[in-house]
Regions:
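Conserved non-catalytic scaffold segment of RNase H-like nuclease domains
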Residues: 1-109, 114, 121-148
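Sequence-level detector for tyrosine residue identity
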Residues: 4, 23, 84, 146, ...
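Generic preference for hydrophobic/aromatic residues in regular secondary structure cores
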Residues: 18, 38, 119, 176-183
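Charge-rich, low-complexity amphipathic helices
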Residues: 78-81, 119, 137-138, 153-154, ...
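A generic structural signal for short hydrophobic patches within well-formed alpha-helices
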Residues: 115-116, 207
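Hydrophobic/aromatic-lined pockets within catalytic cores
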Residues: 120, 124, 136, 159-169
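Acidic, divalent-metal-coordinating active-site segment for phosphoryl/phosphodiester hydrolysis
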Residues: 149-161
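Acidic two-metal-ion nuclease catalytic site recognized across multiple nuclease folds
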Residues: 160-236
Length: 236
């Protein structure tokens, strides 16, 4: 089974359909160094069968006539051997792939955005471009203008991920996945009237209300329930 860094560009943010998808294989060497597998690379534009929003056109530089004669986004298929899928805000990419009828039920997701927020909370931005400026300023200076092109974004993601793994002694994919799963559980509320408040300090009635919301992020749900269980244990 293999691991891939993937990036998608989409027609918009609501029910996103792919306009461009790129991926490349990655593997840890026996010495624990993250390396690219350039022979396992893919890049293609797709017709999203939806009008590309002005916002997406401005960000990606992909216009309706650029993809009018491209294959439909539903033609895309993940490699059959894919076990781990890595991306910056990977859940957005997963939504794009799901809308392209890809089955992700057995795929383990690794999120570099969550890892960066967890390991480097002091940074003023955790966007992919900002992280590239932080870890690889010389590369960023020459190439940041190509951000939001899927081919370049998977390269940027690799450089950011390689730096994170090196600094935190992550040497295999299973260890990286566990680090990502831990990082994806928030410790601070990122929205709502209690934005910025530590999960452990949230009012119990607000936690109860949140847990009843059908569209609650599963990692926030996990953080809330684990904290509630811990608080209950402390009272016993």
């Amino acid at each position: 089974m293999s691991s891939y860094i993937l990036d998608t560009e989409a027609h918009g943010l609501v029910e996103p359909h792919a306009t461009e998808i790129a991926y490349i294989g990655v593997v840890f060497s026996p010495a624990g160094e993250l390396i690219l597998q350039t022979h396992n690379a893919f890049e293609q534009r797709f017709n999203p069968h939806k009008k590309i929003t002005l916002g997406s056109q401005a960000i990606t530089g992909i216009f309706d006539d650029d993809v009018a004669d491209k294959p439909p986004h539903t033609d895309f298929e993940l490699p059959k051997d894919c076990e781990y899928l890595i991306g910056h805000n990977i859940d957005f990419d997963a939504d794009v792939l799901t809308n392209a009828d890809c089955d992700l039920s057995s795929i383990k997701r690794i999120c570099t955005l969550a890892l960066a927020r967890h390991f480097f909370p002091q940074l003023d931005s955790h966007s992919l471009g900002a992280l590239l400026c932080f870890f690889e300023p010389q590369v960023a200076k020459k190439n940041i203008k190509f951000a939001h092109g899927a081919k370049y974004d998977i390269w940027f993601t690799f450089l950011v991920l390689k730096a994170i793994c090196y600094q935190h002694r992550i040497t295999d994919m299973a260890q990286l996945y566990q680090a990502s799963e831990h990082a994806r559980k928030p410790t601070v509320m990122r929205f709502g009237k209690h934005k910025g408040v530590a999960i452990k300090d949230l009012p119990p009635d607000y936690v109860d209300w949140l847990l009843k919301q059908a569209d609650l992020d599963p990692y926030l749900h996990l953080a809330l329930t684990e904290n509630s269980a811990g608080n209950h244990g402390n009272l016993l």
